[in-house]
């Protein structure tokens, strides 16, 4: 224990701390200057006070010092127990088992360390490849391997600690065997009180032990050497560096590592024989080696007669008299302990010799005394014989003589003495018998006491067993009690639940009884409630039927409107073709040019003026507020005319038309030519390379613009002469056109039936060839100003343009006369279609209205184009062919749309019939369950079926023509922004109304749009659909029907 604890300053045994305080390792100077004391050398002799005064050659202080050292050594070994052979074998078996477990654990640790190293290398490789990022699975695998390594390392550390404890038990046993050699008999001649105390302490536990012979000592030394080898092998068990890194070294582990380090150094000293070359760091292991060597020499008995030597100097003794404990002091104390053992062994031998001599003398004296006793006994026997012989002689003498009296007195004396001796012998025998009987009784009582003690011990053991049994029974009963409590609580909960269920069932039974006991009185509360519920459901179904019928009529009206729109588009197309034929027949000096080749010298000019011409098709506003409101209400951003024309050609599905319209067509000078890029291209007045920048803007409400060229119709066109870099300025001219509201209304409604795709294609074709213009005959209600400011760089271009305008006056007069007739019919058709849109709330009709406005603007723009852009002719014949093809395609599409509307109406009617049949079947099942109310339910069902099967003709719908006539005054103020808002509102209110959302609103021209109030449009919508706002959408109708079903089931 002391040997194990003196190697480290971090952790110590508690016994050492109590005995020696806080130990510190010896300094290097102490280790260098301290010489281990060898009692077997010829120069060292320990002399105690038991020797004669002549042999004392040391001072009294040195003797006391050595006796104190010996006493401390014996005190240090006091707690070491002398084990029996059985205990030693058990300890050896445990050590063997732990060594096997240690070997297996070390092998596992080596394998786990290699696995951890491989996982670490994999993680590093992944981190290098992915620049610091690695997979989560690799990290988890490395952590798992590290955890296993730590667990095995801690397990190995615990096993080695247990092995060290068993090794220390064996070492303590061996030191106790050494101390057992000090017999108590040898301490009687020691006069020193310290040595007497030492002898008493050492003899307490080893009174019956005998002196060990040489064979036992040799066996003890061999066992010590084997334990030392095992301790050395413990230091070499772990060699894996990764394992040492994984273990976190605490105080106990550091202590074990220091022990291993010392053992490794000790092994190196044994193998390489470095005792002479050791420096100050290796002196402590060298002292351990010297200590073990001295022990082996002592137990082998090589030096039996050591001689006296001079005492150690006082300074060396003082070094060992410190309160701290170290390995050197421990060795020094054990040296003195062994010297005391040797001296007392010698004194014991001398005392034995003296005892033998005294025994011989005593035997001789005893023999002499026995001889004297035998002689005295013989003498007494002879005296007795002589006395008896004299008495017999006296009896033989005659009686007359006097000696007879003498003889009688002698006989009496002799009888008295014999009687006295017999009495004494009897008393002694009696006393002996009494003593023997008492001794026997004491022995019997002792045996009885021992048996009683054994019985009490057995009873105590039995009581302990009974107590354990009772405790186990108590715990078992307690567990059963807890289980019973749980079962009781569970049963209570079950009973409570059953009670609740019973109460609920009773309540239901009472309800059923009350329902069964209801009288047939029709005036009862139950019958009244049921009738009210059926009436409410009947009303709901009636309202639903009315809504569905109104929707059917709405779809039919939409179908009629589409047919009218398609007819109107066809009429407009024919009129357009007529106008184009008129322009083609004009014989002018300079032919018309509506576009330039795609890859000709004017391509750069086309690209420069695309944005400027797109501004023509989009409106300009008098203020920022107007611009903001209309831009917010538009459903999609305004596309340029090139994109519109591409969309129109793509919707028609003909790639050939697109290619023909997109490419330039070379024709003779007398034939006009139409191109897709005509609007977006620039028109030069003189054909030079550098074009004149022209801006075309539409200003409403007479917005004044500087540098503007006035545009007029007919013969009113005047182009003033200008010089170089001079800007033409003039006031904008208002263009008016009267609208005939009363004439041709019915005719326009019949003819105006445009389709969606025809509108797109035809409007795109017209807009690609003409500019925006206004006629002088437009009514005051539609007032817009069209100004075309032109920045002129070359005066030659201006002069040439003025000449071309003068040449085209005659053709324009003739075109205006034809155009006024077209505008009158188109504007009337516009008002009628607007009235239909307000009443029927259909988004496609609003788009058709916008498209018709674009057509009007396009036709009016023909005059402006004829005045301002007259350069080359185009192919009108190709445009006519394309228009005819588009008309055919639009008719096919309109037929498909009408068929789709019919299919949708049929599907809605079939869904309605299915729902009515489902409700009818549910009511029949519920009526079968109610036997009492069977007759009343049948009557209600019959009335319900009659109300559900309401014909569509019974529902009154307001005539759309009347609506259009009533709202004609208000329709003059309608704008497309309000119409788009209304269409959006209708979509949000009823998702089931599938309007045609494919109608493009991008081609709507806002130049001639007027404004209306939102309130008039909303009133018209409410008048047209009065009940749709109440019930919302078809989805809400379905939810209302399901709720009515639940009400009927609850009432049943």
UniProtKB/Swiss-Prot annotation:
<feature type="modified residue" description="Phosphoserine">
    <location>
        <position position="57"/>
    </location>
</feature>
<protein>
    <recommendedName>
        <fullName>Up-regulated during septation protein 1</fullName>
    </recommendedName>
</protein>
<dbReference type="GO" id="GO:0000935">
    <property type="term" value="C:division septum"/>
</dbReference>
<feature type="region of interest" description="Disordered">
    <location>
        <begin position="788"/>
        <end position="820"/>
    </location>
</feature>
<dbReference type="GO" id="GO:0032153">
    <property type="term" value="C:cell division site"/>
</dbReference>
<keyword id="KW-0131">Cell cycle</keyword>
<feature type="compositionally biased region" description="Basic and acidic residues">
    <location>
        <begin position="670"/>
        <end position="679"/>
    </location>
</feature>
<dbReference type="InterPro" id="IPR029191">
    <property type="entry name" value="Uds1"/>
</dbReference>
<comment type="function">
    <text>Involved in septation.</text>
</comment>
<dbReference type="GO" id="GO:0140278">
    <property type="term" value="P:mitotic division septum assembly"/>
</dbReference>
<feature type="compositionally biased region" description="Basic and acidic residues">
    <location>
        <begin position="750"/>
        <end position="760"/>
    </location>
</feature>
<keyword id="KW-0132">Cell division</keyword>
<keyword id="KW-0963">Cytoplasm</keyword>
<dbReference type="Pfam" id="PF15456">
    <property type="entry name" value="Uds1"/>
</dbReference>
<feature type="modified residue" description="Phosphoserine">
    <location>
        <position position="53"/>
    </location>
</feature>
<keyword id="KW-0597">Phosphoprotein</keyword>
<feature type="modified residue" description="Phosphoserine">
    <location>
        <position position="52"/>
    </location>
</feature>
<feature type="region of interest" description="Disordered">
    <location>
        <begin position="726"/>
        <end position="760"/>
    </location>
</feature>
<feature type="modified residue" description="Phosphoserine">
    <location>
        <position position="51"/>
    </location>
</feature>
<feature type="region of interest" description="Disordered">
    <location>
        <begin position="616"/>
        <end position="687"/>
    </location>
</feature>
<feature type="compositionally biased region" description="Basic and acidic residues">
    <location>
        <begin position="791"/>
        <end position="812"/>
    </location>
</feature>
<feature type="modified residue" description="Phosphoserine">
    <location>
        <position position="59"/>
    </location>
</feature>
<feature type="modified residue" description="Phosphothreonine">
    <location>
        <position position="60"/>
    </location>
</feature>
<dbReference type="GO" id="GO:0005829">
    <property type="term" value="C:cytosol"/>
</dbReference>
<dbReference type="GO" id="GO:0051286">
    <property type="term" value="C:cell tip"/>
</dbReference>
<feature type="compositionally biased region" description="Polar residues">
    <location>
        <begin position="631"/>
        <end position="669"/>
    </location>
</feature>
């Amino acid at each position: 224990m002391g040997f194990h604890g003196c190697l480290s300053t971090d952790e110590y045994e508690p016994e050492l701390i109590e005995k020696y305080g806080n130990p510190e390792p010896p300094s290097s100077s102490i280790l260098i200057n301290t010489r281990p004391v060898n009692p077997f050398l010829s120069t060292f002799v320990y002399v105690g006070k038991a020797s004669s005064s002549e042999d004392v050659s040391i001072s009294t202080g040195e003797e006391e010092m050595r006796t104190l050292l010996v006493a401390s050594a014996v005190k240090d070994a006091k707690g070491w127990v002398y084990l029996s052979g059985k205990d030693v074998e058990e300890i050896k078996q445990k050590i063997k088992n732990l060594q096997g477990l240690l070997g297996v654990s070390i092998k596992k640790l080596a394998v786990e360390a290699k696995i951890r190293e491989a996982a670490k290398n994999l993680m590093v490789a992944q981190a290098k490849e992915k620049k610091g990022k690695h997979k989560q699975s690799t990290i988890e695998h490395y952590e798992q391997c590290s955890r296993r390594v730590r667990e095995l390392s801690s397990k190995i550390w615990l096993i080695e600690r247990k092995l060290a404890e068993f090794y220390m038990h064996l070492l303590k046993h061996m030191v106790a065997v050494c101390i057992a050699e000090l017999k108590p008999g040898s301490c009687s001649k020691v006069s020193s009180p310290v040595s007497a105390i030492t002898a008493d302490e050492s003899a307490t536990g080893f009174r019956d032990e005998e002196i060990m012979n040489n064979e036992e000592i040799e066996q003890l030394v061999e066992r010590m050497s084997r334990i030392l080898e095992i301790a050395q092998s413990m230091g070499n068990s772990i060699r894996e560096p990764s394992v040492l890194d994984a273990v976190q070294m605490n105080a106990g582990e550091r202590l074990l590592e220091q022990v291993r380090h010392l053992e490794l150094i000790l092994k190196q000293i044994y193998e390489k024989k470095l005792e002479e070359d050791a420096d100050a760091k290796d002196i402590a292991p060298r002292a351990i080696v010297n200590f073990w060597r001295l022990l082996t020499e002592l137990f082998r008995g090589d030096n039996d007669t050591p001689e006296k030597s001079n005492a150690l100097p006082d300074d060396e003794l003082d070094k060992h008299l410190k309160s701290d404990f170290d390995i050197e002091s421990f060795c020094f104390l054990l040296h003195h302990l062994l010297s005391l053992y040797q001296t007392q062994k010698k004194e014991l031998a001398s005392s034995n010799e003296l005892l033998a001599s005294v025994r011989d003398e005593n035997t001789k004296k005893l023999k002499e005394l026995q001889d004297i006793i035998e002689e005295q006994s013989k003498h007494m026997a002879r005296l007795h014989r002589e006395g008896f012989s004299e008495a017999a002689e006296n009896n033989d003498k005659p009686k007359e003589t006097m000696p007879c009296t003498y003889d009688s007195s002698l006989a009496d004396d002799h009888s008295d003495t014999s009687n006295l001796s017999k009495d004494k012998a009897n008393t002694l025998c009696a006393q002996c018998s009494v003593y023997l009987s008492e001794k026997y009784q004491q022995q019997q009582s002792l045996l009885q006491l021992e048996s009683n003690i054994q019985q009490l011990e057995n009873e105590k053991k039995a009581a302990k067993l009974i107590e354990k049994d009772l405790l186990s029974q108590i715990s078992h009963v307690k567990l059963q009690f807890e289980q019973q409590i749980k079962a009781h609580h569970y049963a209570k909960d079950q009973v409570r639940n059953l009670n609740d269920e019973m109460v609920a069932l009773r309540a239901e039974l009472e309800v059923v009884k009350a329902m069964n006991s209801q009288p047939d009185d029709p005036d009862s509360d139950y019958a009244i409630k049921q009738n009210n519920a059926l009436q409410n459901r009947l009303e709901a179904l009636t309202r639903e039927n009315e809504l569905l019928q109104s929707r059917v009529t709405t779809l039919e009206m939409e179908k009629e409107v589409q047919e009218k729109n398609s007819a109107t588009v066809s009429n407009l197309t024919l009129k357009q073709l007529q106008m184009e034929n008129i322009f083609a027949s004009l014989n002018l000096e300079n032919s018309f040019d509506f576009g330039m080749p795609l890859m000709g010298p004017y391509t750069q000019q086309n690209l420069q003026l695309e944005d400027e011409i797109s501004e023509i098709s989009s409106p300009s506003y008098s203020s920022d507020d107007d611009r903001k409101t209309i831009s917010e209400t538009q459903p999609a951003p305004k596309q340029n005319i090139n994109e519109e024309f591409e969309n129109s050609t793509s919707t028609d599905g003909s790639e050939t038309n697109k290619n023909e319209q997109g490419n330039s067509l070379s024709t003779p000078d007398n034939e006009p030519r139409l191109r897709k890029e005509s609007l977006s291209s620039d028109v030069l007045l003189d054909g030079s390379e550098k074009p004149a920048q022209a801006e075309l803007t539409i200003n409403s409400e007479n917005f004044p613009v500087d540098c503007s060229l006035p545009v007029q119709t007919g013969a009113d066109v005047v182009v003033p002469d200008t010089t170089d870099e001079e800007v033409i300025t003039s006031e904008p001219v208002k263009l008016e056109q009267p609208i005939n509201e009363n004439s041709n209304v019915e005719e326009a409604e019949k003819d105006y039936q445009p389709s969606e795709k025809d509108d797109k294609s035809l409007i795109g074709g017209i807009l690609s060839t003409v500019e925006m213009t206004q006629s002088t005959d437009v009514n005051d209600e539609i007032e817009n100003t069209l100004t075309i400011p032109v920045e002129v760089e070359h005066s030659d271009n201006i002069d040439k343009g003025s000449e071309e305008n003068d040449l085209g006056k005659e053709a324009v007069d003739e075109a205006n006369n034809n155009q006024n007739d077209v505008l009158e019919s188109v504007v009337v058709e516009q008002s009628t279609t607007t009235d239909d849109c307000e009443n029927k709330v259909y988004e496609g009709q609003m788009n058709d209205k916008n498209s018709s406005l674009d057509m009007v603007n396009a036709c009016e723009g023909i005059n402006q184009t004829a005045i301002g852009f007259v350069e080359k002719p185009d192919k009108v014949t190709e445009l006519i062919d394309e228009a005819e093809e588009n008309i055919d395609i639009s008719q096919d599409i309109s037929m498909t749309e009408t068929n789709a509307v019919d299919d949708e109406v049929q599907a809605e009617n079939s869904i309605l019939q299915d729902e009515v049949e489902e409700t009818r079947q549910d009511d029949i099942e519920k009526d079968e369950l109610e036997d009492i109310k069977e007759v009343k339910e049948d009557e209600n069902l019959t009335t319900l079926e009659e109300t559900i099967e309401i014909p569509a003709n019974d529902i009154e719908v307001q005539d759309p023509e009347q609506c259009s006539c009533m709202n004609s005054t208000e329709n003059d103020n309608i704008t497309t922004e309000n119409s788009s808002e209304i269409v959006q509102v209708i979509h949000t209110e009823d998702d089931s109304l599938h309007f045609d959302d494919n109608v493009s609103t991008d081609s709507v021209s806002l130049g001639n749009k007027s404004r209306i109030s939102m309130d008039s449009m909303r009133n018209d919508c409410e008048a047209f659909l009065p009940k749709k706002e109440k019930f919302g959408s078809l989805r809400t109708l379905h939810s209302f029907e399901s709720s009515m079903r639940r009400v009927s089931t609850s009432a049943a």
